[in-house]
Amino acid sequence: VSASSKGEKIAGLKVTPDKFLPHRYAGASGDFNPIHIDNDFAKMVGLPSTILHGLYVMGLVAKAAAQEAGGDPRALKRLSVQFRGMSFPEQEIEVTGEVIEADGTDVTFDLIAAQGENLVIRNATADVSYG
């Protein structure tokens, strides 16, 4: 058990996805939208480059919450997020958060995922059960 008291910060995580991650994620998820895997297409539709899949970043938020329970994904009972911005390959994503509720072995975290000042996911809440 890591963070378990109201106001306590979680360990969080930092990840820098390589330029091939969107291709691997597309293969795993079946989401081959060209804004994720074709740089020329992404630029044609007004993006600066390809963007990461939002659900990939959501997965990082889930991983950060589960890490607080020793890395056991079964401890994550509920996850809710707001997608607020785009994220890009080859730029570090940092997931941070803190405990907002604690009741015995049940803890709720407030989390964000950001690339620098760009909040990619905010107002995320995760319920984790340590029991």
Residue spans for each PLM region:
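HotDog/MaoC-like acyl-thioester-processing domains
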Residues: 1-11, 87-131
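Hydrophobic beta-strand-centered segment that forms part of the acyl-chain substrate-binding groove
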Residues: 44-99
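Hydrophobic residues in beta-strands and at strand termini
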Residues: 17, 83, 128-130
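A broadly tuned preference for mixed-charge, low-complexity surface segments
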Residues: 34-37, 62-67, 113
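Catalytic strand-loop segment that frames the active site of acyl-thioester-processing enzymes
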Residues: 1-52
